[in-house]
Amino acid sequence: QYIKIVVEESEDVEGRTKMTDKVIENNQVTVMGEVVSNFSYSHEIYGEGFYMVDIKCTRLSDSFDIIPVMVSERLLDVTASYVGMLLCVNGQFRSYNRHEERKNRLVLSVFAREVKFIEEMEESSKTNQIYLDGYICKEPVYRKTPLGREIADLLLAVNRPYGKSDYIPCICWGRNARYAEHFKVGERCAIWGRIQSREYMKKLDEEHVEKRVAFEVSVSKLELLEEAQVQESIV
């Protein structure tokens, strides 16, 4: 069980605009990579259609992550195929709960605010980077892998405008894992890292398993933010 933490928005227009800007700044993603799927319909809000497309982001290790991106039909012609083309996406990492098998499943994707096609990928490019400023909403889970690697799992609540929040799973390694182990629910935390995809096997019953893909933030840097900074962001 986790708690929802929401920062109150200002009632006046100027204050509302400032708060919206701050909330947008607290969830920033850039992914660059090859388009590896066509668009599939997701949903519609106030007449604006949203579609999903997959981007293949390479890692330094020559492996890769397939990142789902949600794009408005107003940003791109979603009836066209861009498979094989290189795309740069700026946006936010968002979550929603999908009800299935009598449970809620957390579904994550990059919500595109800006998209542009690029000619080539430079080796020095930051092809997959994310910054989050949110609140610890579940007790951190620290453990060691069978090979002795230290890991800590965090769930970060990141505020959106109008009282909504995104719940982002984050994984810390080594020294960061030992540091994050002691974080408390409700503390404000800043995280830098990358979005990674991870395959796992879901046991459906005694005889059947299903391959699924989880998405999470692999943390390269994190810090707790002081109360003074928290108050400053609310004012």
Predicted regions and their residues:
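Single-stranded nucleic acid-binding surfaces, predominantly the OB-fold ssDNA-binding core
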Residues: 2-7, 12-235
